[in-house]
Amino acid sequence: MAKKNKGPKVTTVTNKQGETLQVFETLEDFETFIKQETEDDEFDHIHCVLNYYPPFLLHHSHNDPEKISDQNNCHSRKFVRHLHQHVEKHLLKDLAVALQSPDLKFSNKSKDQTFEKIVWLYNDDASYHDKPFHVAVEVTARHDDALVNVDYRTTPRTIAV
């Protein structure tokens, strides 16, 4: 009997610029991947994408994405408010824990809103094992569905002497 792979379920995609990135469909797999990369010392050069339904929507639909209302999108003030709370109180804090950087506060943040979508940008610098790196998280909610896109990117940072 074959042993089950307990690692995160991920799809690897190459974008137009030739960059390879991992695409996740569940928040748990995404956080597991970040944690594993941090433990493997591969944390300072990651680019991955998460496309998922937020937990508060899945809870209300009894974990059935088919039951999620079409009205849950970036035009719904209630959806936007709950999504923003989820991102700031759960997603970003969980990323800081996965990166083993409790000082990561994502204090540099901005919001860009159009009719088509809402984008929140979070940036911060951190250091782990004396290796400084920059973390950028872009969270996008669109007007046509409740699926949320998270673009997570870390890049090495050099310290000026």
UniProtKB/Swiss-Prot annotation:
Q: Which residues form a coiled coil?
A: none
Q: How does it sit in the membrane?
A: Peripheral membrane protein
Where is the protein localized? Cell membrane
Q: What is its main location?
A: membrane
> What's one GO BP annotation on this UniProt entry?
energy reserve metabolic process
What residue intervals traverse the membrane?
A: none
Pfam families according to UniProt:
RGI1
InterPro entries xref list: RGI1, RGI1_sf
Keywords attached to this entry: Cell membrane, Membrane
Q: Name one GO cellular component term.
A: plasma membrane
**Tell me, what does this protein do in biology?**
Involved in the control of energetic metabolism and significantly contribute to cell fitness, especially under respiratory growth conditions.
Q: Which family does it belong to?
A: Belongs to the RGI1 family.
UniProt protein name: Respiratory growth induced protein 1
Q: Which organism is it from?
A: Zygosaccharomyces rouxii (strain ATCC 2623 / CBS 732 / NBRC 1130 / NCYC 568 / NRRL Y-229)
